[in-house]
């Protein structure tokens, strides 16, 4: 490699800038080089600012023509083109190069004597340099100061205080050479920015202003003295904000220190403030003089005008108005004085010689007033005492006591007037979903209420009473309101507990009043909710030891029930009144109330089926803002046994979750979170398993889930598919596996292959532990093993699906309360149903045989499950790692893993991945929610590794 001298032999000169102020990118490069310098020199990259000027040599035209192309540029030229932001601009003035500041100083006219002075200085420096080169002895600063007898000037910075980080930053921003925004972006694109330093922005936001930055560039190999790696940059606030958003490299922000300062105000004013104050005072004096002059002129004019007006008014009043009004004033004053004189004479006559007082005394004495007042004294005393007593009693009443009303006692025995005269209950049959059977049964009542004459002509007796029974929340009250809303008739609604009061006879009175109101406004509907509080079965008073139960409270309740029985089917049945009762405890009702003639129809309102649940969810979803990507049919099919009230609560809970997560509408994830909160419970924040515990739980749950997917994929099994797996602790559980529910027929007619596949799914948790951990299994899968043991025994004994076919009834070995986390693996509770096939252990040999056959069946299915999971060990381990990383995984993701990790995939392919816990997969509902825009992390390419 050529030396530095070879470079200078090319005519290239280097000069180091002293203190540039701006970054103007101008490069002077040679278009051609001399033909005699063909040696290629690999110079180190110069990162600091430098200036390169290549002088043209004569006789090099031929070589210049060949080097015009970019590929023929020398190394230094290419460095200048690639790193324009690091080259400080230089300007040629004569034969000398100057930076921007030096060129500005030259333009001021001071360079006339500078040339001669610089020439003398260079001569002196060269002479001094030759003298110092000759002397090779060491020179110390103390010796120089000791020998020096002149004045010694020390820079004041030596005695100055240490600058803080913030002050040093401001100084560097001011002194360092400036870099433009375009240069910084070029350096950022080439990854040459080492550090970007800025100062913390204060709490007050400014729309205009500037922010300073210090840019540290990366060093490159080469001469360090020729590199400048530190620059300053000053940008507007908007440009600075845009730059900080765009720049993603290392940053350092200097914290702004807020300190209080207490000091003495200077005795003398600031010269600028003094000049401003004096100018303001002069202007104020001029304005005051102008205002005073204007006031004198305007004041004189106003005074003249006021004097003229007042003079005119005085002359008019004295010489015109007063002569005209004088006769009238004399007349009115004379009449007024005459009236006063006559009145005074009359008053004197009345009050003289006793006057009126003597007449009043005679009337009181001889008119009998005194004797009457003596008789009224005791009467007034009694009245005043009663008034004070009542006033004291009313003042002691509680705050929530009603206003004293004489008719309150009468209204106490009446039923509350809850009739809607127009039948405006606000509910129609269109608002009722999921209980189509009950609605069809009640259509006849609506027809009768709309047209009762048609039934009377045909001689048809409509059903007098209808009992609605069923679990809570299934829509019994809603159906009753829909009947009145469809028919448009008055609707009277009361609860069974409202007929019970502290006073005797109030319940019967309210029954009579309620039916009286309904008969007056017939056709009408009477609805009593929770009728079991009113019509409980009566006690048998003729049985032994039953008199103690027949107390006053029981007698009052039975009296109210008797009145209800009479109103329903007595001598006056009251045609045109439909009676509806609702209860969820039919077994408590009195048999006399349930007989035909009183309750002619008893309609069972059951929980809705899958179609009914879907209709209910659609009705409630129409009242909230729900995303179109939410699949309501999956929730309708996977939530068996849920009533309409619970489905309504699900939608409301999902809306609350969406608000809590600041979503614009209800998403699929919000519905899933709401299902988990209502079934399992909320997330337990304080409970978090360690890594080993999470690995065990994840292995067990993934083993159960992936076994079902493998059986569906390779054996076409008719079992549930996994919906999602979670290891987030909720409620009383540490992990959950949610399955998709099959149709109802699959649970009614279970076949042996289907039950054996379910047995393999239950054994999948323990099998997965053995595949991953070997014989070091844990009790994490004990919940699934208990169900598997009883399922195998029940296949042999009660369901008799294995030979020999012998019924051997026995009760379940343990009682379990199923916790719903999706479609249960115990087949809707039928797993622990003994079908009343329970017998005492008579043949103990049969018990031993059943136990032996159950053990063989479990071992056989367990070995098959272990073999199936060993073939897919890579997919199993990949699913476990993804679950540990994401805490929750969907069934679609499990299918994605099984597609990319087929059976017999080498385990090393998974272990060689950079991040085995990542998965480049987005579920379908998330893709729909994001508008078909999916961002997938391609850090791990599964297709390339499998």
From Swiss-Prot:
GO terms for biological process: chloroplast fission; chloroplast organization; embryo development ending in seed dormancy; plastid fission; protein import into chloroplast stroma; proteolysis. SMART domains: AAA. It comes from the Eukaryota. It is found in: Plastid, Chloroplast inner membrane. GO terms for molecular function: ATP binding; ATP hydrolysis activity; ATP-dependent peptidase activity; chloroplast protein-transporting ATPase activity; metalloendopeptidase activity. InterPro entries: AAA+_ATPase (IPR003593), AAA_lid_3 (IPR041569), ATPase_AAA_core (IPR003959), P-loop_NTPase (IPR027417), Peptidase_M41 (IPR000642), Peptidase_M41-like (IPR037219). Oligomer. In the N-terminal section; belongs to the AAA ATPase family. In the C-terminal section; belongs to the peptidase M41 family. This is Probable inactive ATP-dependent zinc metalloprotease FTSHI 1, chloroplastic.
């Amino acid at each position: 490699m050529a030396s530095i001298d070879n470079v200078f032999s090319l005519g290239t000169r280097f000069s180091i800038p002293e203190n540039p102020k701006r970054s103007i990118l101008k490069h002077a490069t040679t278009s051609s080089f001399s033909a005699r310098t063909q040696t290629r020199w690999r110079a180190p990259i110069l990162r600091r600012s430098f200036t390169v000027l290549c002088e043209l040599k004569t006789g090099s035209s031929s070589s210049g023509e060949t080097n015009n192309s970019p590929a023929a540029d020398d190394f230094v030229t290419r460095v200048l083109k690639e790193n324009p932001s690091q080259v400080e601009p230089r300007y040629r003035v004569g034969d000398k190069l100057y930076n921007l500041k030096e060129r500005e100083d030259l333009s001021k006219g001071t360079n006339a004597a500078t040339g001669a002075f610089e020439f003398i200085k260079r001569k002196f420096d060269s002479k001094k340099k030759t003298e110092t080169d000759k002397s090779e002895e060491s020179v110390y600063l103390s010796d120089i100061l000791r020998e020096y007898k002149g004045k010694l000037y020390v820079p004041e910075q030596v005695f100055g205080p240490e600058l803080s980080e913030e002050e040093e930053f401001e100084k560097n921003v001011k002194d360092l050479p400036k870099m433009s925004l375009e240069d910084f972006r070029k350096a950022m694109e080439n990854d040459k920015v080492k550090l970007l330093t800025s100062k913390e922005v204060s709490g007050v936001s400014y729309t205009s202003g500037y922010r300073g930055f210090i840019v540290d560039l990366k060093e490159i190999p080469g001469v360090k003295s020729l590199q400048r790696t530190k620059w300053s940059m000053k940008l507007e606030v908007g440009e600075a904000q845009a730059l900080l958003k765009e720049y993603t490299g290392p940053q350092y922000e200097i914290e702004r220190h807020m300190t209080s300062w207490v000091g003495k105000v200077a005795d003398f004013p600031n010269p600028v403030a003094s000049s401003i104050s004096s100018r303001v005072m002069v202007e104020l004096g001029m304005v005051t003089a102008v205002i005073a002059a204007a006031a004198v002129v305007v004041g004189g004019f106003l005074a003249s005008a006021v004097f003229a007006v007042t003079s005119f008014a005085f002359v008019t009043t004295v010489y015109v108005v007063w002569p005209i009004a004088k006769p009238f004033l004399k007349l009115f004053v004379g009449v007024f004085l005459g009236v006063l004189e006559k009145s005074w004479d009359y008053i004197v006559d009345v009050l003289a010689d006793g006057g009126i007082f003597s007449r009043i005394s005679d009337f009181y004495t001889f008119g009998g007033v005194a004797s009457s007042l003596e008789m009224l004294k005791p009467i007034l005393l009694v009245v005043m005492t009663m008034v004070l007593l009542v006033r004291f009693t009313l003042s002691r009443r509680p705050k929530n006591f009603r206003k004293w009303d004489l008719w309150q006692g009468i209204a106490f025995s009446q039923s509350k007037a809850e009739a809607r005269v127009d039948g405006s209950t606000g509910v129609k049959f269109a608002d009722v979903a999921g209980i189509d059977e009950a609605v069809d049964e009640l259509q006849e009542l609506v027809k009768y209420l709309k047209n009762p004459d048609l039934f009377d002509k045909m001689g048809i007796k409509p059903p007098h009473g209808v009992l609605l029974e069923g679990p809570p929340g299934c829509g019994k009250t809603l159906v009753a309101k829909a009947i009145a809303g469809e028919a448009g008739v008055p609707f009277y609604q009361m609860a069974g507990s409202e007929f019970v009061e502290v006073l005797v006879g109030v319940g019967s009175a309210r029954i009579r009043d309620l039916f009286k109101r309904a008969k007056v406004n017939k056709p009408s509907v009477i609805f009593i909710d929770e009728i079991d509080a009113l019509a409980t079965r009566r006690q048998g008073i003729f049985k032994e030891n039953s008199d103690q139960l027949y107390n006053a409270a029981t007698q009052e309740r039975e009296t109210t029930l008797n009145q209800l029985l009479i109103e329903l089917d007595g001598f006056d049945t009251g045609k045109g009144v439909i009676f509806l009762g609702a209860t969820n405890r039919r077994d408590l009702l009195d048999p006399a109330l349930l007989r035909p003639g009183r309750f002619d129809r008893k309609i069972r309102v059951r929980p809705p089926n899958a179609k009914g649940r879907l209709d209910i969810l659609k009705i409630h979803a129409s009242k909230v803002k729900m995303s179109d990507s939410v699949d309501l049919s999956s929730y309708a099919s996977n939530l068996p046994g849920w009533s309409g009230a619970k489905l309504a609560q699900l939608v409301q809970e999902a809306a609350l979750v969406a608000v809590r997560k600041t979503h614009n509408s209800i998403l699929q994830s919000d519905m899933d979170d709401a299902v988990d909160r209502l079934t399992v419970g909320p997330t337990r924040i304080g409970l978090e398993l360690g890594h080993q515990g999470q690995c065990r739980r994840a292995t067990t749950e993934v083993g159960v889930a992936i076994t079902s997917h493998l059986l569906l994929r390779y054996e076409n099994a008719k079992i549930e598919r996994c919906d999602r797996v979670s290891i987030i602790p909720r409620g009383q559980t540490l992990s959950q596996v949610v399955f998709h529910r099959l149709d109802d027929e699959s649970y009614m007619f279970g076949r042996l292959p289907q039950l054996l596949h379910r047995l393999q799914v239950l054994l999948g948790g323990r099998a997965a532990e053995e595949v991953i951990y070997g014989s070091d299994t844990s009790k994490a899968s004990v919940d699934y093993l208990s169900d598997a043991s009883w399922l195998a025994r029940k296949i042999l004994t009660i369901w008799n699906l294995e030979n020999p076919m012998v019924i051997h009834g026995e009760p379940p070995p343990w009682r379990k309360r199923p916790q719903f986390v999706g479609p249960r693996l115990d087949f809707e509770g039928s797993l622990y149903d003994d079908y009343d096939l329970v017998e005492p252990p008579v043949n103990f040999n049969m018990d031993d045989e059943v136990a032996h056959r159950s053990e063989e069946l479990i071992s056989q299915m367990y070995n098959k499950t272990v073999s199936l999971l060993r073939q897919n060990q890579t997919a199993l381990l990949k699913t476990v790692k993804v679950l540990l990383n994401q805490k929750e995984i969907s069934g679609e993701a499990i299918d994605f893993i099984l597609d990319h990790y087929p059976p017999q995939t080498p385990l090393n392919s998974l272990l060689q991945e950079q991040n085995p816990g990542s998965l480049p997969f987005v579920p379908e509902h998330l893709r729909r929610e994001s508008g078909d825009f999916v961002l997938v992390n391609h850090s791990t390419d599964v297709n390339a590794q499998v």
